[in-house]
Amino acid sequence: MPLNLPFSSPLKLPLPRRFIILILSASILILFLHTFAPSTLPPVLTPNLPHHEPDASYFSPSKWLPPILNPNAPTRPLEFDEDGQCLFLSPFDALSAAEKARARVLSLDEISPGIVRADAPPAEGTDADPDFDDEFSELSNATRKMPAGLTHPILGLLRDGEAKWNSMVTMQSQTLEQAVDVYMDRWGRRPPKGFDEWWHFAKANNVLLPDEYDPIMNSLLPFYALPIDTLKERLVEAEKIPETFTLIVHDGKVELKWNDDYSRDTWWASRPRADSQINLMEPFIKHIGTFRATFTIHDQPSILLDHERQEELLTAARHGKISTHPNELDRAEQNWRKACPPDSPLNKGEEELEAPDSFISSHLAAMDICQHPSYMENHGMLLEEKNSDSHPKPHTKLYPILVPSKTALNGDIPVTPIGKDGRRDDIGHDPEWNRKSGKLYWRGLATGLQHNKKAGAKWRQSHRERLHFLANDKSDTYTEVLSPVGSSGEAELARMPLRELGQYYMDVKLAGGNWQCDWGDGTCEEMEKEIDFAPKDSSERSNDFKYVFDTDGNAWSSRFPRLMASNNVVIKSTVFPEWNTNSLPEWYAYVPSKMDYSDLFSIMTFFRGTPSGRGAHDEVARRIALNGQCWVERTWRREDLQAYMFRLYLEYARLTSPDRDNGKMDYVSTQKKASKEADDVPAAADIETPVIDQ
């Protein structure tokens, strides 16, 4: 019996109406699936949803294969716990199965401190392999032909970055007693008086990494080799250094003393920085004792001892000895070679070549100027000569000066960022990840050095100018780029036009016109002719990009916490370790880049994929961006800045106290515990302090 429908069969409708009904039905189905089951649709039909290869060509299978049928499409993990606390995600888990398998057996070869490349596969790393360069191991940092089947080194860096972070978090002290034990194991002495009050403050404010304060003691250690009377003299002399201010803490109160009229009346940043440091003290000032701390008003460090003297002081301090020989002529110079060991690559004149297939594994080690001689020719602060007319004036004598940034060689004492009480700036409107551009973004002023024909004559080699020239190259130059081979885990070197790379991967420019330049000698005019300056952008502009670059200015980059707080992957290049660099996990919460930028296009190729749409790792990048946000939320709060400064002031109060060496400024919990610990670690009061002549 035929079925009688209350309406005409679509098959009996005119052909145009059939197409209309078909299109409407398909649209309704797509809309339904888009709302309730988006993973069943190919990414090309869901452009507003995240995709692990968003920049792939429309002819790429990944654009047409629904995620539910695509084994390479990673799942989306939870980003917050039930209390709204951000969760750290696993970038490594977002790799394909083939990439994970390769990464687990990958060996990374360190070619210089903090810099690695993938080790050649054993089966192919032989003389029988025509693609293997057996002279590679004898070269310092040179480019070579890639062995066939080589694993991409970034896979191993993702593996190691995650393991480093997980291990660090797991190993943190949970009790005051554990924290004391960790301190004594690291430094061979008891913590400072008031350590228990600091611990209670840290725990009450949920400080995530209470054991990671090594930069404090590393910077203070040389001062322990100075006799108390000598250190007292240095404190007085430090207050006479121009362009500084001193905080005088006594009986739970703080007094601000300006050490010159310029600092008080002229320099715009002086008052906000001093006030910010004072405001940070408020919750703990009653616990930090009595001391006088002198701060520079500048961003850059000023103390640079000769290597021999620095080692003498460190050796004496580590052995609990005192040096009475001053042996420190205060020369108004900044001689980096004298600050490095005689057998260092810098003093041996070793050449460090660009290498697109090597990457930073340990950023702290990679910042070592002595081990990376190329820095002397590609960073503004190292290119520029310093003398008695410089600001700040350089010193080769160990003065206790607190500073917002320093290199690993400088003798200054690092403090936390000090703008707006050290708080992160408001990041503004931050679009969803999939609505951001896949290019790398950077805008900045032409800072880094004074541009002139004298001390700043090499300004074209400075770090900011080089970045601009690299991204906006208009020549026919080719460069090598290490590219992923799909999602196989393999890598290949390819020569590509620098101009095309810049156009595809970069939105990077110097902005605001010439800056810090000499009009009298014609340098400003040269800058205007050679640099296509962009207009200044708002700080929110960087939020429109998945990848943002951060590099040094005259010193450290104050924009770093704001960039990390937004939903971007921060790619950072610097020679300045900061107060919390030890706790910043590479390739997990951010991506480090070498100072010569030779790895920059290789990094972008790994994450965004090749211009033809191959090998993108968008979900890996998204998770790194979220980890960066979470890292800032968990470790760069106002309370974290206070915890650091609280601990620094406790250490500083002991260091500068007349009772430094008699044990009265050490922490002991109870008389019973003090007696027990005295059997293992003698207090300074129980031993005669040896004196050595150095």
Swiss-Prot record:
Entry-linked SMART domains: CAP10 (SM00672)
EC assignment:
2.4.1.-
Report membrane topology. Answer: Single-pass type II membrane protein
Note the InterPro entries from the entry: CAP10, O-Glucosyltr/Glycosyltrsf_90
Annotated region (Disordered), positions in chain: 661-694
**Any GO BP:** capsule polysaccharide biosynthetic process
Effect listed in the UniProt record for changing D659A: Impairs enzymatic activity
Q: Which PANTHER family match?
A: BETA-1,2-XYLOSYLTRANSFERASE 1, KDEL LYS-ASP-GLU-LEU CONTAINING - RELATED
In its UniProt entry, what is this protein called?
A: Beta-1,2-xylosyltransferase 1
